[in-house]
């Protein structure tokens, strides 16, 4: 495939054109009075949204160079959304201003590398200032406010605050689609994993199709159990103790399964067999978690433990085990709190080390099952389109609320950036083009507030000057057009969202300014199909 190459100013300008087209479509959605954007779908009704990432994802430009420019800014929005669940439009607006002002200076003869260094130094200083002015989230109301702003719905904010209240900071909150209208919150006590009973004959409550064991022993085995002779010694000991038995193993099959089922049907002995969750190393880790939680040990040939030699001391205990067709819940495991805390710290250390988003998500889930709990928010809506958009918004709001708890909150509405800039630039000592880079950042910090004001039908420049003259923490409530104490009025952003937006925007701006060539694929001209043969035209 042939390639095209553009150099220097022509390359940078082409990238900028692509970026501007995407940014102009996204920035109209910023703020409480943000406008909507209609997205055409190949099939079905068009989607109407004011979510920055959804709009950015839909934009595909025809010109190859412009397309690359737009893709770079999409990356800013996506990265900010992944990290903090919000701030995508803010990041796009910041990136557009940084690039526009930066390219203007490069065209005037400034050194791109010096500008980049200046932008990076100023960004770092502003991020420090943001974290200094951030306030810790102390009340449930503050979490609700933050989540409400992200989701654009106070009911959603309240529900997320309630979920976080119940499952704690380490807990996992998932969002699922529901068949009914409205919102539902479902809380899980204890550890739950997605594996159900191996045979429906284990069911103790036929109405709810559940197997419920009170105060059971729990056998945790990282192996298949098929021979009954391996299982008999354990069964006899548990029967003598007069307790039921829950078996969590790689698989239970053959005569071992038949023996358990027959004894259950006869009423001789209550038990339930469940396949272990996960695969490979992840299964091993999750069985280890269950063992720590219940105070048992994983029975495995690797550690020299054979099934036939297992005593009651190697089995776990719990107040209750509830098993349905699809999932198992262990309530109040009898594990040693110190060992559980040690395991939690070990998982936390793994989370910090990992580079993979998927691994991080799975580790977070394991952490929640051990330390916190799991809450499920079920979302319903009238149409498929509305359901998808609503679910996406609520997922963002959950990440947003978690970000607020992590790094604290700052005044929303573009005010925090403006005020962090005030203190940050006093301490900066740069010269030449590096100082110009810092001034570009100073200019960019006004952009989000300006855009919020413009979207609300106000004069951006006038609003920025007015907010500059107000005391710290005060700004424009674009919903009412009044100037208020932002945090008291509940107009807040997580510091992590604002920080991520600026860092990601500055990172892309640096790439734009230091680009000297762009290589793109040459668009192929569509070949006209050959005309069909006309025969001999003999009539």
UniProtKB/Swiss-Prot annotation:
The name of this protein is Chaperonin GroEL 1
Give the record's GO biological process terms.
Answer: protein refolding
Q: Name one GO cellular component term.
A: cytoplasm
EC number(s) for this protein?
A: 5.6.1.7
Short name of any one Pfam family annotated for the protein: Cpn60_TCP1
Catalysis performed (reactions):
ATP + H2O + a folded polypeptide = ADP + phosphate + an unfolded polypeptide
Q: Which Gene3D superfamilies match?
A: GroEL, GroEL-like equatorial domain, TCP-1-like chaperonin intermediate domain
Q: Which gene encodes it?
A: groEL1
Coiled coil (residue ranges):
none
Please list the residues that bind ATP.
29-32, 86-90, 413, 493
Provide the family line.
Answer: Belongs to the chaperonin (HSP60) family.
Which organism encodes this protein? Answer: Acidothermus cellulolyticus (strain ATCC 43068 / DSM 8971 / 11B)
């Amino acid at each position: 495939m042939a390639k095209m190459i553009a150099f220097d100013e022509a390359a940078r300008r082409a990238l900028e054109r692509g970026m501007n087209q995407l940014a102009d479509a996204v920035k109209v959605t910023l703020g409480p009075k943000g406008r909507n954007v209609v997205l055409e779908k190949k099939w079905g009704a068009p989607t109407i949204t004011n979510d920055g990432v959804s709009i950015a994802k839909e934009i595909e430009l025809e010109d190859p160079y412009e397309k690359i420019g737009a893709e770079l800014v999409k990356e800013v929005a996506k990265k900010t959304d992944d990290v903090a669940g919000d701030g995508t439009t803010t990041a796009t607006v910041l990136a557009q201003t940084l690039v526009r002002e930066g390219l203007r200076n490069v065209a005037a003869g400034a050194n791109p590398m010096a500008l980049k260094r200046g932008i990076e130094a100023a960004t770092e200083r502003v991020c420090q200032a943001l974290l200094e002015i951030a306030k810790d989230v102390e009340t449930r109301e503050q979490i609700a406010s933050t989540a409400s702003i992200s989701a654009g719905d106070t009911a959603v904010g309240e529900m997320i605050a309630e979920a976080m209240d119940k499952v704690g900071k380490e807990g996992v909150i998932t969002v699922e689609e529901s068949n009914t209208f409205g919102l539902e919150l479902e809380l899980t006590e204890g550890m739950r994993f997605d594996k159900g009973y191996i045979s429906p004959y284990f069911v103790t409550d036929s109405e709810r199709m559940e197997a419920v064991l009170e105060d059971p022993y729990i056998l945790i085995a990282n192996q298949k159990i098929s021979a009954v002779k391996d299982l008999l010694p354990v069964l006899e000991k548990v029967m003598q103790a007069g307790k039921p038995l829950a078996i969590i193993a790689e698989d239970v099959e053959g005569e071992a399964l038949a023996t358990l089922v027959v004894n259950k049907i006869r009423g001789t002995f209550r038990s339930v067999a469940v396949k272990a969750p996960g695969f490979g190393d992840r299964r091993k880790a999750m069985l280890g978690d269950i063992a720590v939680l219940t105070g048992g040990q994983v029975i495995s040939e690797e550690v020299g433990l054979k099934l036939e030699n297992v005593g009651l001391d190697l089995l776990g205990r719990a107040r209750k085990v509830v098993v349905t067709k699809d999932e198992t819940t262990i309530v109040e495991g009898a594990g040693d709190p110190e060992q559980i805390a040690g395991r939690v710290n070990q998982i936390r250390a793994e989370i910090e080390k990992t580079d993979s988003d998927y691994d991080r998500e799975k580790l977070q889930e394991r952490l929640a099952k051990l330390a916190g709990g799991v809450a499920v928010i079920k979302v319903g809506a009238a149409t498929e389109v509305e359901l998808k958009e609503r679910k996406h918004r609520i997922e963002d709001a959950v990440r947003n609320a978690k970000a607020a708890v992590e790094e604290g909150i700052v005044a929303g509405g573009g005010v925090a950036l403006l005020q962090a800039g005030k203190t940050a630039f006093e301490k900066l000592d740069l010269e030449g083009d590096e100082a110009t880079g810092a001034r570009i950042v100073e200019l960019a910090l006004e952009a989000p507030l300006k855009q919020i004001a413009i979207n609300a039908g106000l004069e951006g420049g006038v609003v920025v000057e007015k907010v500059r003259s107000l005391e710290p923490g005060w700004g424009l409530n674009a919903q009412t057009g009044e100037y208020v104490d932002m945090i008291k009025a509940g107009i807040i952003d997580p510091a992590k969202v604002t920080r991520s937006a600026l860092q990601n925007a500055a990172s892309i701006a640096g790439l734009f300014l230091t680009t000297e060539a762009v290589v793109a694929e040459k668009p192929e001209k569509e070949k006209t199909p050959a005309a069909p043969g006309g025969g001999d035209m003999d009539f």
